[in-house]
Design a protein with these regions (language model features):
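Active-site and adjacent substrate-binding regions of carbohydrate-active enzymes
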Residues: 1-529, 534-556
Length: 556
């Protein structure tokens, strides 16, 4: 297997608005990331993925881009970005940036010109249709129709919010504009891109109505606007024109790609270095996009999804491993549900957090840690829908009410799933607002910040933060690299349902076993003899696992 830096790297996703504010306006900024680079270096991070920082009206927190060549003033200046790239490079930390190429903001100059003049060259950059009636009954990802009125008998298409008009990838001129943007940022010094919602760029039969899949009379945009026939030509062209250098790391948010087609996306000649798999992250939802349709699941179900993903990816290319991101709730609350540690039970929180950390660092693929995950951050406590910022959360609340749930039930659904759970300000210290800002934070802080803050955990050698540091060191250790990074994943079949057990097997036959008890009861195990690499308890038995115990052993 080809060896390359991004396969061996551990990444850290930064949601800049919530990471560190340096000027007291309540919004995190690029200088805040720069200030905390030593913290990331100490953690063992090789690259950071920074969520959008471009000029934006912030209807969708930066995923509505108004200018791909600039920096939003709330985040700083281009000089700040240049300095961040320079200082990160000096510390051996590469920078990956979010690239949103399915849509722009409705405030982008292209769209404004297209609206102002139907004969503008930019009209073809978007999907405009002349029609007296709504062109089709397709539902957007954020609810309601994908079609929005743009003057008399004219409509434009939006996969997400109406403030995010979709780009028309059928236009060669538009595609060349997008490739110029990628080349600009690579010349700036970024080491790669995370491509947002990239499998939505091709639409088929977008003007045709279909049998509704819900009482709103609409059908999901996934039917005609996700991973459609013809997308491969677009992705291949982008790859050939911009991304042929194997040193450039590319990771795609690529929903809708079946496992049997993964080699086209991440194989030796694939379009991207890796893709995110949503199957196990969305285990708590039934098919569709309604958060009130919560799915019952067991740890047996989780294991099936995890190992199906791992086994499918390892035969076709390379994967991106994560448990949390800016679009997900916190993993504590998702995977442990009602068993998640009470806020004042810090020992239980350590056990559960270290169990999840061991799973994350034991799997095959490039590891992504989301900000605050290394501290054991949990979902927040939102007391009303007014406390939320996320537009999707507000739409999901409305959907639940329309489906007949009362306000308390609807709030419970969005409390469980809201993207704002992972977007709350990072807790640096026990000071006001967790040391995130000297002003009023743009989103409320989690009320447990003093108990789990980074400063407190840095001073405690037995903290979850130190456990993460140690795991990252173990993963990168030369003695473990061939097993833990490049080795095959093989499930240990005789493990009990609530025990996730697997081996990482190097080409030379060396093995590392990982055993994780996801339950609050002692469970039977059959751990191999060997060197204990990590253990979240002070003792180890080969035949049993304590509640939430996680053990990694290099087999003899």
């Amino acid at each position: 297997m080809k060896r390359i830096w991004w396969k061996e790297a551990v990444g850290y996703q930064i949601y800049p608005k919530s990471f560190k504010d340096t000027n007291g306006d309540g919004i995190g900024d690029l200088k805040g990331i720069l200030e905390k680079l030593p913290y990331l270096k100490e953690l063992g991070i090789d690259f950071i993925w920074i969520c959008p920082f471009y000029p934006s009206p912030m209807k969708d927190n930066g995923y509505d881009v108004a200018d791909y060549y600039g920096i939003d003033p709330c985040f700083g200046t281009m000089e700040d970005m240049d300095l961040l790239l320079k200082k990160a490079g000096e510390l051996g930390i590469r920078v990956i940036i979010d690239m949103v190429l399915n849509h722009t903001s409705d405030q982008h100059a292209w769209f404004r010109e297209a609206l102002k003049d139907p004969n503008s060259e930019y009209r073809d950059y978007y999907m405009f249709v002349q029609s007296k009636e709504r062109p089709s009954n397709t539902r957007s990802c954020f609810g309601g129709s994908v079609w929005e009125k743009a003057g008399e008998d004219c409509w434009y298409y939006h996969t997400f919010d109406k403030s995010q008009p979709d780009l028309n990838w059928e236009s060669q001129k538009l595609r060349e504009e997008l490739y110029n943007i990628l080349n600009y940022w690579m010349e700036k010094g970024v080491s790669g891109f995370r491509f947002d919602a990239i499998t939505y760029i091709k639409k088929v039969n977008s003007l045709v109505s279909h049998e509704p899949d819900n009482t709103d009379g609409l059908i999901s945009v996934e039917t005609t606007g996700q991973n459609q026939e013809g997308i491969r030509e677009f992705l291949q062209e982008m790859n050939h024109k911009c991304l042929r250098d194997p040193e450039i790391m590319t990771v795609a948010e690529a929903p809708g790609v079946p496992y049997e087609n993964l080699s086209e996306f991440i194989g030796e000649d694939g379009y991207f270095s890796m893709v995110f798999d949503f199957s196990y992250a969305d285990i708590d939802l039934l098919p569709g996009s309604n958060w009130y349709n919560q799915a019952p699941w067991t740890f047996g179900d989780l294991k099936k999804l995890l190992f199906r993903s791992q086994c499918s990816v390892q035969t076709q290319g390379w994967g991106a491993i994560y448990l949390e991101n800016h679009d997900q709730s916190r993993s504590f609350n998702k995977y442990f549900r009602e068993k998640a540690a009470a806020r004042d039970d810090l020992h239980l929180r350590f056990l559960q957090g270290s169990a999840l950390a061991t799973l994350l660092m034991g799997l095959r693929g490039t590891v992504f840690v989301y900000q605050g995950e290394e501290l054991g951050s949990e979902n927040g406590k939102f007391n009303s829908i007014e406390e939320y910022d996320d537009l999707n959360t507000k739409d999901q609340y409305r959907r639940a009410l329309c489906a007949g749930y009362d306000e308390a039930q609807s709030l419970k659904f969005v409390n469980d799933r809201s993207r704002d759970n992972s977007r709350m300000p990072f807790p640096w210290t026990a000071e006001a607002n967790g040391g995130f800002t000297s002003g009023m934070p743009w989103l409320k802080c989690n009320d447990d910040y003093a108990a789990i803050c980074a400063k407190k955990q840095e001073q405690d050698k037995d903290s979850l933060l130190h456990y993460y540091r140690n795991l990252i060191r173990i993963r990168k250790d030369e003695a473990n690299r061939e097993s833990l990074i490049y080795g095959e994943v093989r499930e240990i079949q005789n493990a009990l349902e609530s025990v996730i057990a697997f081996e990482r097997i190097a080409e030379n036959g060396e093995k590392i076993q990982i055993w994780i008890n996801m339950s609050d009861e002692t469970r039977q195990a059959d751990i191999a003899e060997g060197e204990i690499l990590c253990n979240n308890y002070s003792e180890t038995s080969q035949k049993s696992l304590n509640p939430y115990q996680a053990v990694m052993v290099r087999c003899r």
